[in-house]
Amino acid sequence: MSFEQTIKMPEDRIGVIIGKNGHVKEDIEQKCNVEIDIDSESGDVQVSSQASRLDKMEPFKAIEIISAISKGFSPERAYRLLKEDLLDLLDIRDYAGKSSNSIQRIKGRIIGKAGNTRKTIEDLTGASISVYGHTVGFIGSFEEIRIAREAIKMISKGSSHKNVYNMLQAARRRAKFEKMQLWEHEGPQPSNRTDF
């Protein structure tokens, strides 16, 4: 028994999944123990693996990595998915409707001047963010994605960048405080030694 799944890639992302001299494709194949066949004309990317690999989730990780690359992430950022990180997508059309002008305006607000808004959200949450087409992609832990997604929703609904940054900084302080409390509650463990 074997595993096989086909993913449709946008035409302008085919070159990224192949990589220079085929290195990205080979890298994904090696890291995930899969075979990848790419049809450059149709945009179909077929991932296949032997059944023995399914218990390690490797083929599914390959599909997640390819999906992330198709949504605008660089291969290096997509490789975060090999760890415990997750991929999540948000459709800008939920906030802009189908108007291409509204979609472009919201994308511009999310990216910011010279990419500063996106970079600030990434820095304050730890999530990687990609804006491609009408979607915003997130890679990170559940909590990183939750906070970054909330920031993007606020921007998409028209909140000022200042309010979004304030929310992000408050969330960051709260997370640090919770981490400190966890450390205090665990604290150093008493020694069981009796030979003092």
Stretches found by the model and what they are:
Residues M1-F196:
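RNA-contacting regions in translation and RNA-metabolism proteins
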